[in-house]
A protein has these predicted regions:
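Signature of the catalytic double-stranded beta-helix
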Residues: 2-83
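Short beta-strand-to-loop capping motifs
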Residues: 11-14, 91, 177-181
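Polar/charged alpha-helical tracts
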Residues: 43-51, 115, 132, 190-194
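Short, charged, solvent-exposed linker or helix-capping segments at domain edges/interfaces
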Residues: 45, 99-102, 187-190
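Secondary-structure boundary elements
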Residues: 51-57, 92-97, 184-185
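A structural signal for short, well-ordered beta-strand segments and their strand-loop junctions
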Residues: 58-60, 86-90, 99-102, 154-156, ...
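Catalytic core of non-heme Fe(II) oxygenases with the double-stranded beta-helix
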Residues: 66-148
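Catalytic core of Fe(II)/2-oxoglutarate
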Residues: 119-202
Length: 202
């Protein structure tokens, strides 16, 4: 049986508070992305990461996905395919999912050069890549894995992934922390499985 290299749930000793900046629904679009300032981070989570000699990047984003099939497009979070990992917290319906994809033979990635206005206007010096990502069209991909995200989760964001919210009434908010090691490099999924072996589960 193939090892799941996409997702794990996490058991944490606290319930992460929902950022107060998540106070507006954006149901006129499929999805909405915004920068989440440090003042909205949960300090208990930051202290918990320190126990593992880890820390969040200074770039943290929030995503809103509308009801009735809203979702992020298929993309990854790095300039090339990789196995970098984020920790996500999600508030919303118990049916919304994250899906992971693999490009079909003969298909090509699209290079995404985002404007990232929501990050640049914060006047910070990003400590991670925000300049280039990969995107793909669903018809050119095979679905590899899908999981309901309803509790804190390790998310492999180096692989192609997207979100889907089938709920008819409730939107989905996510806070995504980019996890860095003490040398400021991005934590890899395999490393995360070892580090969080006592609190990660499928």
């Amino acid at each position: 049986m193939n090892k799941n290299m996409y997702h794990r749930y996490l058991t944490l000793p606290f319930e992460h508070s929902m950022p107060k900046c998540y106070n507006t629904e954006h149901n006129d679009v499929d999805y909405h992305v915004q920068f989440v300032q440090k003042e909205w981070w949960d300090l208990r989570f930051i202290e918990w990461l320190k126990n593992y000699q880890l820390k969040p990047s200074n770039v943290s984003e929030g995503f809103y996905v509308r009801p009735n099939g809203g979702g992020l497009p298929i993309h990854n979070d790095s300039a090339v395919l990789s196995n970098i990992v984020n920790i996500n917290f999600t508030w919303g319906p118990p049916t919304s999912t994250t899906r992971w994809w693999q490009l079909k033979n003969g298909s090509s990635y699209e290079i995404e050069l985002p404007e990232n206005t929501h990050i640049i206007e914060q006047k910070i010096n990003p400590d991670v890549n925000i300049k280039q990502y990969l995107r793909a069209r669903e018809e050119e991909c095979d679905l590899m894995y899908e999981q309901v995200i309803h509790t804190p989760s390790l998310i492999n964001v180096g692989q192609l992934h997207n979100t889907h919210n089938p709920d008819t009434k409730m939107g989905r908010w996510t806070l995504s922390y980019i996890i860095l090691k003490s040398d400021n490099t991005h934590l890899q999924f395999e490393e995360a499985l070892k580090i969080f072996k006592d609190v990660a589960y499928e």
